[in-house]
């Protein structure tokens, strides 16, 4: 019988209420081009990373995305988000309690994020590195989410089979990545709705989540 061998956590919007910080920086960046960030463009950016994120942004703003423009925007965004990540970042409801619950049960955990390592470290300052046996960032694998690379690498580092791990995500992009890696999936939407699909279990928040819920997800996933 399949057992729960690991929990793999997304960071932005799942553990930390940090999407608002990204939103602030993106709106400021759009303003520098004399544009206004629309809700549709913002939603399309949630979970995106690297050059693809800036192509989505520039297309949405109606701006030509030359290589030079993308590089300049990326440098500005990293500097601004670094400023905003200084100091404690708010937690998502129930996230800290669930981390404590899983750790107390002795189940290994990994942080699996599309955020660059340099920025993820600021998030880890708030969360606490002691929770995780591994942390994997998008700039440390060939392809970020929605590719499965970050999840496959996290499972490898923990020495677990992806199908015996539960991924906890908040976005469509992250959900696709987790399922492509073969993980059981719990979706707790934050800033943008996540479409229902086979293999996706939804909760409104992490408040009240029990270890048995995660164990059941693995069993159901193994039998699907």
Segments from the language model and where they lie:
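Metal-dependent phosphoesterase signature
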Residues: 58-97, 105
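An amphipathic alpha-helix signature
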Residues: 23, 27, 50-55, 74, ...
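Helix-loop "lid/cap" segments that line or gate small-molecule binding pockets
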Residues: 27-30, 51-65, 123, 155
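Active-site neighborhood of HAD-like aspartate-dependent phosphohydrolases
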Residues: 1-43
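Conserved phosphate-coupling serine/threonine residues in phosphotransfer and NTP-handling enzymes
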Residues: 14, 113-115
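Asp-based, Mg2+/Mn2+-dependent phosphohydrolase catalytic module
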Residues: 1-5, 96, 100-103, 116-117, ...
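Helix N-cap/coil-helix junction residues
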Residues: 35-37, 63, 129, 159-160
């Amino acid at each position: 019988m399949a057992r729960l061998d690991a929990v793999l956590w997304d960071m932005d919007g799942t553990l930390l209420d940090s999407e608002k910080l990204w939103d602030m920086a993106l709106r400021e960046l759009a303003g520098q081009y004399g544009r206004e960030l629309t809700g549709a463009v913002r939603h399309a950016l949630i979970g995106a990373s690297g050059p693809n994120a800036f192509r989505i942004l520039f297309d949405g703003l109606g701006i030509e995305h030359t290589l030079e423009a993308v590089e300049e925007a990326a440098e500005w965004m990293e500097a601004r988000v670094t400023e905003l990540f200084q100091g404690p970042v708010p937690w998502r409801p129930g996230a800290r309690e669930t981390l404590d619950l899983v750790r107390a049960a002795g189940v290994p955990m990994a942080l699996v994020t599309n955020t660059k390592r340099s920025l993820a470290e600021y998030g880890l300052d708030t969360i606490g590195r002691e929770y995780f046996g591994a942390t994997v960032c998008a700039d440390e694998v060939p392809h970020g989410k929605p590719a499965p690379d970050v999840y496959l690498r996290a499972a490898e580092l923990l020495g677990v089979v992806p199908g015996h791990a539960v991924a906890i995500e908040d976005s469509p992009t992250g959900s696709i990545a987790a399922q492509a890696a073969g993980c059981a999936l719990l979706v707790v939407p934050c800033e943008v709705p996540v479409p229902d699909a086979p293999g996706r279990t939804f909760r409104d928040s992490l408040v009240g989540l029990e270890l048995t819920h995660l164990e059941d997800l693995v069993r159901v996933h193994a039998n699907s």
